[in-house]
A protein has these predicted regions:
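Short beta->alpha connector loops
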Residues: 11-13, 168-169, 184-187
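Class I SAM-dependent methyltransferase SAM-binding "motif I" and its flanking Rossmann-like core
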Residues: 110-177, 233-236
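Structural signal for conserved beta-strand scaffold positions within catalytic alpha/beta enzyme cores
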Residues: 32, 60-63, 137, 157, ...
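Class I S-adenosyl-L-methionine
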Residues: 1-133, 214-222, 232-248
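Alpha-helix boundary recognition
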Residues: 25, 51, 127, 149, ...
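Short gly/pro/ser/thr-enriched loop/turn and capping motifs at secondary-structure boundaries
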Residues: 37-40, 141-145, 188, 207-209
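A short acidic, often aromatic-flanked loop/helix-cap motif at beta-alpha or helix-coil junctions
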Residues: 65-71, 144, 170-172, 206-209
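A contiguous loop/helix-start segment that scaffolds small-molecule binding in enzyme catalytic cores
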Residues: 3, 173-248
Length: 248
């Protein structure tokens, strides 16, 4: 059976590419992991894309199994979570696509499928369960490019590397290394960034809720941390990303 992985950009409906629209037109069923009422906006955004570009497509929501968000053994917990997701999705594929492969499925992935997204790994786990899944992968606008564009800045400084990491791993960064930080459930910059570093922060990029802040960590770090708490409390969820960089 065929299950495509289609990048839909960082949040704006305009981020979806002509290639992605063409791929979506070939699809019969879009699968989505349903994260509950707190993140219903994410499911609604996918439904809006389907309604606009491929109204013939059925959206199937598969309940996302819960997991511990602050585990002692992060890797083992996430691998177990991915396995449980794969088992649920394997059943959904068979139920809605059929083993004979006459229907085509897809996932609509925020940002680009290659960057801090688990869909491709989970599909491999589905294959390991004995379900023959073939996938096209359609790239798209990343949260990184949406962040730098929103701030009107280049990602890298001349002759300097950029680390892409998570909030959980920010403390392992070599001092002075510029870094893009994703999947920060808290405010790791308060503990692991130099007060003299500049932070370029954005939340809900590309949406009507887009919120941007920038400045020295020592000047705006606490403000951004409080703002992030307020936005999460107001909307029930938040997607944010930031760039930390030292002086040129």
């Amino acid at each position: 059976m065929d299950v495509d992985v289609i990048g839909i950009g960082a949040g704006s409906p305009s981020h979806i590419s002509l290639e992605a629209i063409g791929a979506l037109a070939d699809v019969d069923v879009v699968f989505a992991l349903d994260k509950g009422d707190a993140k219903a906006d994410l499911l609604a955004a996918r439904q809006a894309i389907v309604d606009k570009h491929a109204p013939h497509v059925e959206l199937v929501a598969v309940p996302d199994p819960p997991r511990d968000r602050t585990p002692d053994n992060y890797g083992a917990v996430v691998r177990d979570w991915h396995q449980r997701r794969a088992e649920l999705l394997a059943d959904a594929f068979v139920a809605h696509l059929g083993r004979e492969g006459k229907r085509r499925g897809a996932f609509l992935v925020w940002g680009d499928p290659s960057l801090y997204d688990s869909t491709l790994r989970i599909l491999q786990r589905v294959r390991d369960l004995g379900v023959d899944v073939r996938s096209r992968v359609i790239p798209s606008v990343t949260a990184i490019s949406a962040l730098t564009a929103a701030h009107g800045e280049c990602l890298n400084q001349i002759g300097k590397p950029v680390l892409i990491t998570t909030g959980r791993r920010l403390g392992e960064r070599t001092p002075g290394t510029d870094a893009v930080v994703m999947l920060d459930g808290g405010a790791a910059w308060l503990e692991h960034a130099d007060p003299e570093e500049e932070i370029l922060w954005g939340a809900f990029l590309g949406t009507e809720l887009e919120t941007l802040r920038r400045g020295r960590v020592g000047d705006v770090g606490e403000e951004i941390a409080e703002l992030k708490k307020e936005l999460r409390a107001e909307h029930g969820w938040i997607m944010d990303i930031y760039l930390l960089r030292s002086g040129a």
